[in-house]
Curated annotation (Swiss-Prot):
Alphabetical GO biological process terms: cell division; cell wall organization; peptidoglycan biosynthetic process; regulation of cell shape
Function: Cell wall formation.
Encoding gene per record: murC
Catalytic reaction annotation: UDP-N-acetyl-alpha-D-muramate + L-alanine + ATP = UDP-N-acetyl-alpha-D-muramoyl-L-alanine + ADP + phosphate + H(+)
Full protein name: UDP-N-acetylmuramate--L-alanine ligase
Residues noted as binding ATP in the record, renumbered to the chain: 124-130
Annotated EC: 6.3.2.8
Intracellular or extracellular location(s): Cytoplasm
The keyword Cytoplasm belongs to this UniProt entry's keyword annotation: yes
The keyword Metal-binding belongs to this UniProt entry's keyword annotation: no
Amino acid sequence: MSQPLSLTAEQPVHFIGVGGIGMSAIAGILAERSYNVTGSDPKQSAQSQLLRQQGARVFQQQNAATIDAICSGVDRAPLVVVSSAIPETNPELEAARGAGLRVVHRSELLAWLINAQHSIAVAGSHGKTTTSSLIASLLHSAGLDPTAIIGGVVPAFGSNARNGAGEWLVAEADESDGSLVRFHPQLGLITNLELDHTDHYPNLDALVATMRRFSGNCSSVLANRDCPVLSAELSADHWWSLQENSSAHFRAVPLSLDGAGCRADYLEDGRRLGELALPMAGIHNLSNALAAVAACRLAGASFADLQAALTELVPPGRRFDLRGEWQGRLIVDDYAHHPSEVDATLTMAQLMVSSGKSTLPWVPKRVVAVFQPHRYSRTAQFMERFAEALGCADEVLVAPLYSAGESAIEGVSSATLAEKVQQAGHSARALADMDSLVDAVQQCSSAGDLVLVMGAGDVNQLWSRLQSSADQQGLATAA
């Protein structure tokens, strides 16, 4: 049994892979709280730069020399933090263990933060980042000054982390490796449950078992009544629903859903409190927003404050994120990497086309999907569902599969996925490498189109590639 984690401000803390979206958020909170924070990451990122501005020391190399450097001139041995993305063969991790330093998983440090104050931990297969971002933004607007540790950049804060002075901490509880069972929040929120992360969960029952352990650790649970798995398999103290006839404690009955946003009647325990107006399209976003409002109400925020703040909300980074205009096309980036997420994102985009209303600068003529499969295991598990979801686009470009360190599986590739889309009667092509994506986008899209870039790998770099190509050709882009 590992020793319980307890930190004081004198304890140096070192993050291996500090530029990651989850690691950098925790590091940022500690830096803001005047801890001696160091980190390493070979990739430079906006998160790494922000940490430097907060006083953290960030190394670009990951090797034994970094461990020597952080151990030099300190009175206490540094605590070393890693995520599941760091392999045991990482040379810096090997050096840390060789030096006898204590090494903990990021979830242990996050649990220490969550368990130390009133907290809201947002779990679930989809919508965690959006929902936790909305909760933090709404609590901030309501004057409750929350601390936030989010898996995406929150527009209201310009960061994935915020160190507030209020009693509430909002954190995203990632289920991908099962480590969320370490958390004991005051309020556990579960957005939905669906099989994913098949590298860790062999079946849905295994995922449900983990979520039961998590919910059992929560003082109170708020869950989505509209999710059939949650309704059947888990118990909750509070439920939310978009269904008019539901018995859920918190309801938002849709009045209008179009490409420019959502409107719904809001009810608590059957009593109508007013109308919610959300400037984000998609039924999934209305569910996320209702969950956020419900959580904030349980945290003590007034409905009037939440109602007003909701109209100004913006989704977090990489969630239908408008990067800019390129040769008359709108380029939008999204983190969707599961079939349900791809389907929801493309459905939202096509709603803008069909309704003639859009949150974007103009109503798109067509939707061109650029999708990068993420992990061989996930692509193999959901090949048919990915093909079905991508069929919602007018054109499909499949970028090279991002392995995330997994070994190849025979018969699983971007080309195989493109063939599946074609077999269903839709236009699709696979790209051999990332360099060919720019030409493919130019060939398969036209001025007025929406180019929707989806994936959890490096496909988000397409925008910078498009900008570079425009600079080389003397063409205009608008960010």
